[in-house]
Each structure stands twice: as structure tokens, then as C-alpha cells.
Amino acid sequence: MKRIIGLTGGIGTGKSTVSNYLASIHRLPVLDADVYARVAVQPGSPVLSQIAERYGAGVLLSDRTLNRRRLGEIVFSNPAERRWLEEQIHPYVRDRFLAELDALEAQQYPTVVLVVPLLFEAGMTDLVTEIWVVYCSKEQQMQRLMERERLSLEQAQARINSQMPIEEKRDLASIVLDNSSTLESLIKQVDLALKTPNY
């Protein structure tokens, strides 16, 4: 593959909007870390067993699936617990990325997109050839997060603060996609970024 795009940004900045556009309009293969992270904690998985052992049955719903809201309350208010959880999940996500990239390489796809919200924090920048950061203001992040997840101001703030500041991610980007304006503006930036020579 000539291009492996690492698509990242802060929570609520618009990564899904960009990845959906790249998949549906540009027909690019999109591999999503969040999808793999959900698979990692499916009922019966070693990771879910470790989570239940550490935090008790309260993090499981009656059908033995993960109670995401309860786990979120624990890890987003305690950086040490969040790090522990990430240490359980990130190796699985990395292995899935590597396996999928191998399969796509065999199919000779020229460009692949990896959606990795914690690209920098999880140390996965070595998997990509360029980094696209979807950016918007912290105020916009807060508003989107509160509306989408129905979180309180304090809960939204805690989730945003759990990630590397968006300004730092922006400074490390190959390409910055500014999502503080209209969808049309964002789409134009994505189209232009795809035409930009590989980094």
C-alpha cells in the first residue's frame, strides 16, 4: 500500500463523518479501532473477564455484556484505571490492524484508512504513513458530546480531558481537517487531502 492514513482527532471532532465519507464516496477500506475495541470486550473474551475481575459484576449487564456507561464512570474519572483498561485493549487492536493491513496488502489496495481516536496516546503512529487530524474547538467538542452521548457538562469535560489536547494532535498532523464550519467545507478539505502527495 502506498498510503496508510491515520485518521484521528478529539472526541466529538467529526472523525466518523470523515471516515464514513471516505468509505462511502471514495470507496476506501476503513479500519476502525473502536470496532476492534468493542470486539475485544465481547462476552467470553479474556479482556472482559479481566475487567469484571477488576471492577466487579457491576460492570456487566444482565446479559453478561459490558455496561459501558458504568465502566466509563470509572475510567474517565480515574487516569490510572483508564491506563489499565487501555493496556488490556490496545494490544488486541494493534494485532487486528496488522492482520487486516496484511490482508489488504495482498489485495493491492493503494490507500487504506485507519481510524484511531488514540493514535498518539496508544503509540500506533508507526502503523501509518500520514496522519490526518479532524479539528474543532473545545466548545464545539463539548456541545457535540453532550448532545450525542447525553452527558452532563462535567462528564463531557472528563472525557475530553482524558485525551491528548486537540491542539497538540493538530500540531503533529500531516493534514488538519478543520471541522468548525460546515459539512461542505469539511468535505472539500477531505477531497483536497486525498489529492495531496503522500507524506
Model-derived regions: residue spans:
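Hydrophobic anchor at the beta1->P-loop junction of P-loop NTPases
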Residues: 7
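ATP-binding Walker
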Residues: 13
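Walker A/P-loop
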Residues: 16
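Short beta-strand-centered segment that lines the nucleotide-binding/catalytic pocket of NTP-utilizing
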Residues: 28-41
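ATP-dependent small-molecule kinase phosphotransfer cores
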Residues: 38-110
